[in-house]
Amino acid sequence: MLPVIKIVRQYERLAVFTLGKFHARTGLRGPGLRILIWPFQTSERIDLREEVINIPRQSNITRDNAAIHIDFLVYLRPIEGEAQKLVLEVVNYHQAVIGLATTILRAVIGEMTVDEVLSQRARINEQIRVTLDDETGRWGMKVTAVEIKEIEPAQEIQDAMNRQMSAERIRRAVVTEAEGKRE
């Protein structure tokens, strides 16, 4: 039996397992010097600071069957009293959050048209945050924010939008010219 000294920083907690079992009363240890008895006790560090996960660009199909690409960020942090769940309930919470966020984004975007997606960024952020927070709560995580970095329609949709804006400018110019000639 060897004593092992662990230094736990202010922003960390140490999940301690004695003979492979986590004890709710004594298993989660706070900041300071912590002595473990090896090989009977092992530990996992849990960082309590807010973390940002970049969700890679996702291709989604809107309700009106238009392709759209979205990049976004998820801000999350462990719930302090439930931090041990990050070790006990999920193997790799980063991958789990990315997978869940991708699925939730597809569901949200699939219910909207392209025009709604382009004009309602805040609503999309909030819908994803609320749904993701409900799911990650069982792992001891709190989703504090979701921020869409970029929304990019497929090239053919961008071309159609550019043609529409150009036609609108020409229409306004013709109306202005006709009003000028009438006077």
State where each predicted segment sits:
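N-terminal hydrophobic membrane-entry segments
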Residues: 1-182
